[in-house]
């Protein structure tokens, strides 16, 4: 059993897991999910910060029982001959365990290990939870002698799990910030969200087809600077992209060439208006994944008339795109699309596109 600590948008992270592992995912409190599988690569997930293998399940456990389990197990591990110096971090989620109590557990592991002839380095806690950056930079879960102990409680159940890795925020930042072409005006879709969208769509497609896809074919019809296509390429997908703006087509081509380290990689990127374009390969697609037109950017809440104008324009463009592509893709093609919404802080509401309520009339379920 694998425990996943969900990210800043836990509902999206949960949906991603449910798409990839249908019937095997159980929500565990507000911050985590349990996946009934033997192994998992955290780097293939966008919506989970950490992954850990469940070691102990306790019920109605007090801090003394939790502490004893951890101290006894990891003090003995420190004297294993096949391991060099043991590095341990401890995180407690929803566990009503204070930072001072975590520090006491760490100190006890270190003291007992020393008595047994072993050495342990304990990563200091400023809070009950070690942040993802700390886990990643200390390589916790990536080596047998570098572990993060995760304690998490939900209702009467306490899980003690041992990390198998944290999200590689260094690689994600590099793909986001050092690619040659970026454009804040057309949107800055984070690689983590792009990866989540890819997994949601491909997971759904695999469920529909009832088979694992070794090289899924995906299209981003609003490709922008190519973030979704980058993440799809890294997962072995055959990528196609179009954009109304020739500048964005060029940006995507340059970014993919940078990612692949090859100008010779065969790109299927071209200019095209998503509301009327014909994709000759559409029937071969496994998924359509995109961040659609987001409308005019605002620095502050627009007046109601302006907002309705922008909302209507976006609704029209996206509806026409959905109608256009529906006539070209096969019935087993999955779609995952991001569309705009506008938060009005003055009246504490979110304005959404009308098409959401009428998606079935566009031919989708």
Residue ranges and their predicted role:
Residues 84-88, 215-216:
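Nucleotide donor/acceptor-binding cores
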């Amino acid at each position: 059993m694998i425990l996943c600590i969900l990210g800043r948008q836990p509902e999206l992270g949960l949906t991603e897991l449910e798409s990839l592992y249908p019937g095997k995912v159980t929500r565990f409190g507000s911050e985590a999910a349990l996946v009934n599988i033997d192994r998992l690569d955290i780097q293939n997930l966008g919506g989970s910060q950490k992954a850990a293998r469940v070691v102990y399940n306790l019920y109605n456990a007090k801090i003394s029982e939790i502490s004893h389990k951890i101290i006894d197990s990891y003090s003995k591990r420190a004297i294993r001959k096949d391991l060099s110096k043991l590095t341990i971090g401890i995180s407690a989620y929803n566990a009503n365990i204070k930072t001072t109590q975590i520090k006491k557990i760490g100190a006890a592991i270190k003291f007992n290990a020393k008595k047994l002839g072993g050495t342990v380095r304990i990563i200091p806690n400023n809070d009950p939870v070690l942040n993802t950056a700390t886990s990643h930079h200390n390589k916790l879960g990536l080596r047998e002698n570098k572990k993060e102990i995760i304690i998490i409680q939900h209702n009467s159940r306490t899980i003690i799990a041992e990390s198998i890795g944290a999200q590689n925020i260094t690689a994600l930042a590099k793909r986001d910030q050092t690619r040659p072409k970026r454009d804040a005006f057309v949107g800055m879709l984070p690689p983590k969200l792009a990866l989540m969208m890819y997994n949601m769509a491909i997971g759904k497609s695999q469920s529909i087809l009832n088979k694992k896809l070794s090289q899924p074919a995906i299209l981003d019809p609003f490709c922008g600077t190519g973030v979704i296509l980058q993440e799809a390429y890294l997962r072995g997908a055959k990528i196609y992209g179009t954009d109304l703006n020739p500048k964005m087509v060029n940006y995507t081509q340059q970014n993919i060439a940078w990612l692949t380290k090859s100008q010779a990689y065969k790109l299927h990127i071209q200019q095209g208006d998503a509301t009327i374009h014909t994709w000759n390969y559409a029937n071969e697609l496994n998924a359509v994944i995109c961040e659609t037109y987001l409308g005019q950017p605002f620095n502050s809440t627009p007046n109601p008339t302006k907002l309705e104008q922008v909302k209507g324009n976006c609704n029209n463009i996206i509806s026409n795109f959905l109608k256009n592509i529906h006539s070209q893709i096969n019935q087993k093609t999955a779609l995952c699309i991001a569309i705009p919404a506008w938060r009005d802080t003055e009246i504490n509401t979110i304005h959404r596109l009308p098409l959401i309520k009428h998606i079935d009339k566009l031919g989708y379920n």
